[in-house]
Design a protein with these regions (language model features):
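Solvent-exposed alpha-helices and their adjacent loops that cap or buttress functional pockets
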Residues: 14-16, 40-41, 70-74, 98-99, ...
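Glycine-rich phosphate/diphosphate-binding loop of Rossmann-like nucleotide-binding domains
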Residues: 57-149
């Protein structure tokens, strides 16, 4: 497997005459953003990163339908996010385009909330979602959240976090193979929640295309 982004771009671009489109898979952030952008600039065929855009499309559909079921408007929701990799950022970009207000989005990576006083170096994709907020943890930002999007790791969302969400919360726990919180645990403390995971053995599977 090629690990040099420049070489990977050259290899894929050289295949253009024999392809109708390119589907990128399993390329980590932030390299995936650069590779996709450069390929789109060089190639005249569609370039699609499934881990980003496939997940974003299906997740956005889940949010739209979930909000309709619980009677909430997309422009009024508070969104908490666990994870800030390629899939999470693509989901957020699409949700913003669909009407979620950027000031109502609170993103957590492995170091906590992406806030305006962070001293570590953030890549451009994360900087778009920096917030001026005293919140520092996922538990903090999940208070009164209408939707939580999990694109992180098993167990990242606890029952205590779910308890303090807004009425009729929507939980997208998309980590695979083990979700951020299992549906039975979420339902035990919030029977009013709608929860989707990336697994086919639970109801409401939300996965990439």
């Amino acid at each position: 497997a090629e690990r040099d982004p420049d070489k990977l771009v050259d290899i894929i671009a050289a295949l253009e005459p024999t392809l109708g489109g390119v589907n990128l898979e399993d390329i980590k952030a932030p390299e995936c953003f650069t590779i996709e952008r450069r390929l789109r600039e060089r190639m005249k065929i569609p370039v699609f990163h499934d881990d980003q855009h496939g997940t974003a499309i299906i997740s956005a559909a889940a949010v739209i339908n979930g909000l309709e079921l619980v009677g909430k408007q997309i422009g009024a929701i508070k969104l908490a996010v666990s994870g800030a990799g390629a899939a999470a950022i693509a989901c957020l970009d699409l949700l913003v385009a669909l009407g979620v207000k950027r000031e109502n989005i609170f993103v957590c990576d492995s170091r906590g909330v992406i806030h305006d006083r962070r001293e570590d170096r953030l890549d451009e994709s994360k900087k778009r979602y920096q917030q001026k907020t005293p919140a520092r943890t996922l538990a903090d930002v999940m208070v009164n959240a209408d939707v939580v999007l999990g694109c992180s790791a098993a167990g990242a969302i606890t029952q205590d976090m779910v308890k303090v969400m807004a009425p009729r919360p929507i939980i997208l726990a998309l980590a695979n193979p083990e979700p951020e919180i299992r549906p039975e645990l979420a339902k035990a403390v919030r029977p009013d929640c709608i929860i989707a995971t990336g697994r086919s053995d639970y109801p409401n599977q939300v996965n990439n295309v």
